[in-house]
A protein has these predicted regions:
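N-terminal glycine-rich phosphate-binding loop and ensuing alpha1 helix
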Residues: 43-44, 58, 93-160
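ATP-binding pocket architecture of kinase catalytic cores
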Residues: 357-463, 479-483
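An alpha-helical support segment within catalytic cores of ATP-dependent transferases
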Residues: 337-355, 455-511, 522-523
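ATP/Mg2+ or Mg2+-diphosphate-binding catalytic cores
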Residues: 327, 334, 590-629
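Active-site activation/catalytic loop segments of kinase-like enzymes and analogous catalytic loops
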Residues: 540-569, 582-600, 614
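Conserved beta-loop-beta/alpha segment of the NTase-like Rossmann-fold superfamily
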Residues: 163-236
Length: 629
């Protein structure tokens, strides 16, 4: 009903400021209605405020605030204060007008891993870490509730079960992002989009820490929080116009306002923004996009303001060392088993463990890099359930046995009980390359040194026993999915019986001598790492396992055998290697099926290993005399 009056007075305001033409479009009206909404909100939150109070809180000139107040008075949204002269209070009409700006809820992004916070995030999602005794996500939930925002959705993924308790404690909703491990926050917003459409919503990061409560029951227009960074910064730097509207974003800058912390989506903003986000989600090559990438690509279409925050209000901890500087408790006690162990082994306080960095996780373990006194080390943490699959006491025995050879990683500590291992990190080292035959020559020399060392341990790697072991595990955890499994299993038994009849020699073997487990040091020397499966076995199994891990074709395997033997292999040697290729493929396919039943996924690895079992059984059957055929 009162739109014409709004239009006339807004035109007057713009003429006064000489910033926009008099023929205002709807977006300009929205801009000023948002400012009127802010006047109403501030008066609701702070009754009996003066013009000067409002100008200070809104960071506007007294003249602009005076014009906005006149507009609010004309619309009957505010009235002069009854008890204190020179102040204003919200009317019933103002309350009704303000309702359109009511915040409907908040979406908290908590799906990611937090790789820069290892080893803490191996056990605990980053948002559940405590700062001054309070978990970061719980602090934000508490602040939201204090502001009157009750409807809270948490987008989860990594260690999602850790957030379940929040349902009972705060009556939140958990929303699962199935792509958390392979895509970035664009995908998280995509999967949560139904919670955003048609609503006024905060978008928060679970791992932010906010000093003061910056949330409100009412928000007027979309915004992105910003903090001023002095000096050079690698954050996303904002450009904005005199109205506070963001006009551009660049990566990195100096002495600038940057994207930092909470965001607010109005329902109008979401109606325009989310369809474009859906398009980008469907576009190949956007898998690692942040949701902000969509905003950056289309600033000409979306209207979102900067919400400048004071210094020391918003904290986004980049790593554990930043958190240590902020919360001194982490300097001495992190309540993390790995860091406590390192401190004990090196006899230093946790504060001297620094430059922590996540290393690429293997198929069974998690590892991270750290420094003490300028030297780099690796700490290995056994993966979930590996205690059932790997005998850590036997692994420790192997490491003690091979130390005189000088072919393994330099061991600092290993526990036969927990499986934790600490070793030196070789700066400048690289993994060998499976198809670099010069690398393979160097690696095979190390294998020869191991096989011919005469060293022994008290345990064996019995591939028959291991196959039956993993078969039982699979049958206990959902079964084995291969349609022809029983037939292939019978073929593997034939190969096992054939090998047993040959009375093959048993020496200390690595079992997992794949290219990734050979390190080429800067001086060209080679180290063989990860001895979890090592034991007494036929030495040729190491060639077979190396081949199937690297997805070798037959000609590649032939080349590897020639390098190892220093000649063309004879038929018996080839038969043995091929047999172990089949058996190794069968074993690791069962291993992968079992791991998949626990929620881990290895893509095509399972099928490739199963194909090795079938293909190399046929090669043995067709080319060599297999007993019983």
């Amino acid at each position: 009903m009162r739109a014409p009056a709004v239009r006339l007075n807004i035109v007057h305001l713009q003429n006064q400021q000489n910033t926009e033409p008099t023929n205002l479009n709807n977006k300009m009206e929205d801009f000023f209605m948002n400012r009127i909404g802010l006047i109403c909100r501030y008066l609701k939150e702070n009754p009996h405020s003066s013009q000067r109070d409002l100008a200070q809180k809104m960071e506007l000139s007294l003249g602009t605030v005076n014009t906005l107040i006149k507009e609010c008075m004309n619309l009957h949204y505010i009235a002069p204060g009854k008890s204190i002269a020179g102040t204003y209070e919200l009317t019933c009409e103002g309350e009704t007008f303000l309702n359109q700006f009511k915040v409907d809820g908040a979406l908290i992004l908590a799906a990611g891993f937090g790789s820069r916070f290892v080893p803490l995030t191996f056990e605990t999602p980053k948002g559940l870490l405590e700062v001054f005794g309070e978990r970061m996500i719980e602090r934000q939930i508490r602040q939201l509730r204090e502001a009157g925002v009750e409807n809270i959705t948490i987008a989860v993924g990594y260690l999602k079960e850790k957030f379940e308790y929040l349902i009972d404690k705060y009556n939140v909703t958990l929303l699962y992002n199935p792509e958390y491990s392979c895509k970035n926050t664009l995908a998280t917003i995509y999967h949560a989009r139904k919670a955003l459409y048609g609503k006024n919503m905060y978008i928060l990061s679970s791992d932010n820490w906010l000093r003061e409560n910056m949330f409100h029951k009412y928000e007027c227009g979309a915004w992105y929080a910003s903090t001023y960074m002095e000096g050079k910064t690698s954050e996303w730097v904002l450009s904005y116009n005199k109205k506070g509207r963001i006009t551009d974003v660049t990566v990195g800058g100096e002495n600038a306002w940057v994207m930092y912390g909470p965001v607010y989506f109005s329902r109008e903003f979401s109606a325009e923004f989310l369809p474009e986000l859906e398009k980008e989600y469907e576009t190949p090559g956007t898998e690692q996009f942040y949701w902000e990438n969509v905003l950056i690509h289309h600033f000409d279409r979306f209207e979102i303001d900067i919400n400048r925050q004071p210094a020391n209000q918003i904290y986004e901890f980049e790593n554990l060392e930043e958190l240590r500087r902020f919360d001194s408790r982490y300097q001495t006690r992190s309540n993390n088993e790995a860091l406590e162990l390192i401190a004990k082994v090196f006899r230093v306080p946790e504060s001297e463990i620094h430059d922590l960095r996540c290393l690429k996780s293997g198929m069974t373990n998690k590892s991270f890099l750290f420094q003490i006194d300028g030297k780099s080390y690796i700490c290995r943490i056994p993966g979930p359930g590996t205690g059932l699959l790997i005998n850590r006491r036997e692994e420790a025995e192997v490491y003690r046995t091979i130390q005189p050879l000088g072919i393994s990683d330099r061991l600092i500590y290993i526990s036969g009980d927990t499986g934790y291992k600490i070793s030196r990190y070789y700066d400048g080292a690289r993994n060998s390359e499976a198809f670099n035959w010069n690398d393979m020559r160097a690696c095979m020399k190390v294998l020869h040194q191991l096989h011919e060392s005469g060293l022994t341990v008290d345990h064996s790697f019995d591939i028959r026993e291991r196959i039956l072991f993993y078969e039982r595990l699979c049958l206990q955890h959902g079964g084995i999915p291969f349609e022809d499994y029983q037939n292939v299993r019978a073929q593997m038994i034939e190969l096992l019986d054939q090998l047993d009849s040959m009375n093959r020699p048993k020496v200390l073997s690595h079992i997992d001598a794949n290219a990734d487990n050979f390190l080429i040091l800067k001086d060209g020397s080679v180290r063989l790492i990860d001895w979890e499966y090592a034991g007494m076995c036929d030495p040729l199994i190491d060639l077979s396992m190396a081949g199937i891990y690297s997805y070798y074709k037959e000609e590649d395997l032939e080349k590897l055998m020639e390098i190892y033997f220093g000649r063309i292999p004879d038929n018996t040697e080839r038969l043995v290697v091929y047999s172990y290729v089949a058996l190794g493929g069968f074993l690791w396919s069962l291993w992968a099926v079992y791991k998949a039943s626990l929620g881990e996924e290895f893509g095509e690895y399972t099928i490739i290993q199963y194909r090795y079992a079938k293909a190399y059984y046929r090669k043995v059957k067709e080319r060599y005399c297999l007993q019983g055929i």
